[in-house]
Regions:
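Short, surface-exposed beta-strand/loop "edge" segments at domain boundaries and coil↔beta transitions
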Residues: 123-125, 199
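Loop/turn positions that initiate beta-strands
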Residues: 112-115
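Low-complexity, Gly/Ser/Thr/Pro-rich intrinsically disordered linker/tail segments
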Residues: 152-199
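Catalytic Cys-His active-site segments of thiol-dependent hydrolases/isopeptidases
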Residues: 125-152
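A short, compositionally biased micro-patch
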Residues: 117-120, 127
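Surface-exposed intrinsically disordered loops and tails
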Residues: 34-58, 83, 87-106, 147, ...
Length: 199
């Protein structure tokens, strides 16, 4: 059993909604400093224009810099400033999609908190009830924000192999899945029961 859970990921991301955050390509929820800005600008000059650097400089000392996949990795790395960094989890959005063995198209999104939402070049975390938390830059905000899944452009959902999705969450089988044809009413783990997709 993994020490990291889908429930824990959602709790961490919900906490991040209350922090002062700003989007920084390649960031891992680290305190914004001039050295951090300079380092990331050298790594990814395409994403650090002069105007963007000036914006980031106004956040020095008061904000945490992160990107979408960095927010997931910061949970695995022990939280703010990543005190428990491990290279085996240091991957990009496509890497997370590729390593997942359990995934599907967004139309089949199960009602399971902690699933990763994916579109090319971007990820978020499903928190239930048709909502997502993501770290983004653009019309949806700058930093960690909560958004609606519908109409956002997500193409797939997936489970990360490093997270335990068996958080003891159970549901009573009563939908129109095949097992209900036998009048099954036993509590079942949400990962083993068909659930209706989010509209």
């Amino acid at each position: 059993m993994s020490e990291f859970t889908a429930k824990g990921l959602v709790e961490y991301w919900n906490q991040a909604l209350g922090w002062k955050t700003v989007y920084m390509w390649g960031g891992l929820m680290k305190t914004v400093t001039q050295a951090f800005i300079d380092y990331k600008k050298k790594q990814y000059p395409k994403y650090y224009s002069e105007a963007r650097v000036k914006q980031l400089q106004t956040k020095i000392g008061n904000y945490y810099g992160c990107d979408c996949v960095g927010l997931i990795k910061s949970y695995l790395f022990g939280g703010i400033n990543s005190p428990k960094y491990k290279s085996k989890w240091d991957t990009n959005t496509r890497g997370m999609y590729s390593v997942s063995k359990t995934k599907g198209t967004i139309e089949t999104l199960p009602e399971i908190q902690g699933l990763i939402l994916y579109m090319k070049g971007h990820v978020g975390v499903y928190i239930g009830n048709g909502e997502c938390i993501e770290c983004t830059l653009g019309k949806y905000g700058d930093g960690v924000v909560k958004t609606k899944v519908a109409g956002r452009g997500w193409t797939h959902w997936l489970q990360l192999p490093w997270l335990d999705y068996n958080d003891g969450v159970e549901t009573e089988c009563g939908c129109d899945c095949p097992c209900c044809k036998e009048k099954c009413k036993k509590p079942r783990n949400t990962l083993k029961v068909w659930v209706k997709p989010v509209k």
